[in-house]
């Protein structure tokens, strides 16, 4: 599967702006500044396809990136305190509206910062994905920021958190070193292949 032929396709700020679901969509979800854009850029080997911002809460739209065989769907980062309640409500309505639609969604990549415990917003999102029956994986970013002992401790911590949720892989990832990149790519390929087989 070719991850390098990719282009920005569309930004939707309202549910009625969402494009038709005519190909599989790999969804990226996570807290503001957790590293969603960096992960997307690393997967497709581009430095600035998805804009990396030092300002949390910058992504206020659902951004669609088109590849040959699937789309990447970048959801607005949640949990940024300095955004107004009205704007938070708009984001929530937009994301809920996206998930409410009958779309081709083989995999949701839920992104968490390995260095820290999941936030209440993270737990709420994972509960939503689990209860909604969405196939999802947890990617633990910024793994290069921890020394070996701390890294292993946090991995065990997250394994314990996810012990009650079946079939959710945990993949440590570093945008700096590329650690975990190949594993995530393979998971995307497998998820799309399995999805296509069930659609036949």
Give each language-model segment a name.
Residues 3-15, 145-200:
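Canonical P-loop GTPase G-domain recognition
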Residues 45-46, 88-91, 125-128, 154-157, ...:
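Glycine-rich, phosphate-binding/catalytic loops in enzymes
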Residues 58, 70, 77-80, 115-117, ...:
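Conserved nucleotide-binding/hydrolysis micro-motifs of P-loop NTPases
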Residues 68-105:
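Conserved nucleotide-sensing/catalytic segment adjacent to the nucleotide-binding pocket
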Residues 88-92, 119, 123, 181:
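Amphipathic alpha-helical transducer elements in NTP-driven molecular machines
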Residues 96-168:
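Conserved C-terminal guanine-recognition region of P-loop GTPase G domains, centered on the G4
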